[in-house]
A protein has these predicted regions:
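Catalytic-loop of the protein kinase fold
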Residues: 147-165
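Activation segment signature within eukaryotic-like protein kinase domains
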Residues: 135-136
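Short beta-strand micro-motifs within the conserved protein kinase catalytic domain, predominantly
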Residues: 91-101
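Conserved short submotifs of the Hanks-type protein kinase catalytic core
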Residues: 99-111
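Conserved catalytic-loop aspartate of Hanks-type protein kinases
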Residues: 220
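Activation segment/activation loop of eukaryotic-type protein kinase catalytic domains
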Residues: 165-199
Length: 317
């Protein structure tokens, strides 16, 4: 699988947004984390009697050795968010390159990945068909904006990069640190990519990523399909729910077998769990199957996906 090398250098990035005072980490609520970064919630003090909404601050993780790759990713993401405006993409609030490098963003309630984890911990039922369709609608619209208006590939679609407000009132796409440029045909624009290559997360990666095929805008559609599957299966793609191996007695041979298992599964369509009844989830299953076609051209565009999901939603409501 291709590895991320050097992010595309931002054209120009200045400190933007209002100046804020960041309290020590113990006074910040951790919202999440990623490779080399932490996302914290900043509760802003009222100003002139007005209540101000909280922010999400993405900062370099202090426990990780300083790395220019992580710094450059954060700068690339800030520059990109400053240029984007879409209701289904997390909003830019501020960026600072002073003593503490941070990106201030609109705060949302939870990531979809966290919501899935909570359902697993509480032994809950899968998400409803309407909730799955809402994710397909909102994130389909966000990807359509990225692919057509901005001409970029998200590059790391997965449940943890989808933010949800309330009971699926609105879903927003986040984490734009490893985007790639697309040409007018929706194909990875290598000439304008510098040294950047597809990054992604293996479990969600499309077949063309795993097997070295052509990267296009349809490469974002596959992992979105797997995200819809996650909402039904309540587990990450290709994980082994029936794995009862005792970790205390694992061996080199066990590790090798585990690696072989995942190498065989990555880039394939996972089976639908037996408890997902076709009558209740027919529309969600239709979208899942369309998004996870092995041949990229057979997958819907982000626009067509959102339109199909809206049609199915109108039938359910």
């Amino acid at each position: 699988m291709s590895e991320f090398r050097t992010p595309i250098k931002p054209k120009k990035l200045l400190d933007a947004g209002e100046t804020i005072t960041i309290p020590p980490s113990p006074f910040l609520n951790r919202l999440g984390y990623g490779t080399g970064v932490s996302v914290m919630q900043l509760v802003r003090s009222p100003r002139a009697g007005q209540i101000r909404s909280p922010w999400a601050l993405k900062m370099l993780n202090k426990r990780v050795k300083p790395n220019r790759v992580y710094t450059d990713r954060l700068k690339v993401e800030a520059e990109l968010l400053q240029r984007m405006s879409h209701p289904n993409i997390v909003g830019f609030r501020a960026f600072s390159k002073s003593k503490i490098l941070y990106l201030g963003m609109e705060a949302c309630d939870l990531s979809l990945g966290d919501m899935i984890e909570r359902k697993i911990e509480d032994d809950c039922e899968p998400f409803s068909s309407k909730q799955i369709l809402k994710v397909a609608i909102d994130i389909g619209k966000a990807l359509d904006y990225l692919h057509t208006k901005m001409q970029i590939l998200h590059g790391d679609m997965k449940s943890y990069n989808i933010l949800v407000n309330g009971d699926f009132v609105i879903c927003k796409l986040c984490d734009f640190g490893v985007t790639l440029p697309l040409d007018e045909n929706g194909v990875f624009d290598k000439e304008n990519a510098g040294q950047a290559l597809y990054f992604g997360t293996e479990a969600w990666s499309a077949p063309e990523v795993i097997h070295g095929g052509t990267i296009t805008n349809k490469t974002d559609i596959w992992p979105l399909g797997l995200t819809l599957w996650e909402m039904m299966a309540l587990m990450p793609p290709h994980s082994r729910a029936d794995d009862t191996l005792d970790e205390s007695v694992t061996s080199v041979e066990d590790d090798s077998m585990e690696e072989d298992y995942f190498n065989e599964k990555y880039g394939t369509r996972p089976d639908v769990p037996a408890n997902i009844l076709p009558d209740l989830y027919s529309s969600a299953l239709t979208l899942f199957y369309c998004c996870t076609e092995t041949i990229p051209s057979a997958r819907p565009s982000a626009q067509h996906l959102a339109e199909a999901a809206e049609h199915f939603m109108s039938i359910l409501t």
